[in-house]
Amino acid sequence: MDLSYETAPAGVTEVSAATLDSIKELDHVKNAALYRTRQASNAVYYLNTALSGGNITGVDDGYFDTASYVVMKGRGFSKNDYANARRVALIDESVESSLFSGESALGKTVEIQGYPFTVVGVVTEKDSYDLVINSMDDYYMYAHDDSQGNVFVPSGTWPVIFGYDEPQNLLLKADSTDTMATEGKAAEEILNSNLNVTD
C-alpha cells in the first residue's frame, strides 16, 4: 500500500514548528508536543480480534516525554520512523492484554483501518500526579479516559490512515500542577495568534 500523501488540504491549518517552539519557550513549560487522536472502535485488529474501544493517536517526536510514557518492552519510535512515516506502532499494556491474550506483541502485525503496522514496543505511563482543577473548563481540558488502551503511530502516517479529519492537539508538560492552567491559557493565545484564517 502506498503511504505517500499530499500536504494538508486548503483550509486545514497545521501548527508550525516556530509556533510549537514559541510554546516550548513559555516560562513554566517543560515540553510540548503535537498529536491527533480518535477512538479506535473496530479500527484496530490483530488476526480476528478487534480492539473494542481505546484510542489511536498519531504522535510527534516529543509526545512520549511530554505525556510521561516510557517504553517497557521493545523500542520507541526512531527518527527514521518519523522521517519515513514507517508503519510501526506502540501500544500500551491494556491493548497488549486485549489483543494478544498473554503473548508478546513485539514484532506482531496489527491492522489499523486496513493498513498493516508492526508493533515495535509496549509503553506505560511513568508519572502520576494530582491535577489542580479550579473550574469546569479545567476539568474538560484535562479529562480523558485511557482505560480501554492506546495505540500510537508516528505522526507522518496519520494523514494516510485517517486524512485530516481530526485537528492537531497540543499537549503541554508544565513544571508544576499549579502552573498548568495558566500555561495552557498562554499556549492557547499563541496558537490562536498564529492561525491564518481567511474568509
Task: Spell out what each predicted region is.
Residues G62-G76, R87-N196:
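Mid-to-C-terminal secondary-structure elements
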Residues M1-A43, H144-D145, Q168:
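Membrane-proximal extracellular/periplasmic loop immediately following the first transmembrane helix
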Residues A43-N48, Q113-Y115:
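Short strand-coil-strand connectors
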Residues S4-E14, H28, Y45-S52, V122-K126, ...:
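Structural beta->alpha junctions
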Residues S16, L20, T57, M180, ...:
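A general structural signal for well-ordered alpha-helical segments in protein cores
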Residues N80-D81:
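Soluble mature domains adjacent to a membrane tether on cell-surface and organelle-surface proteins
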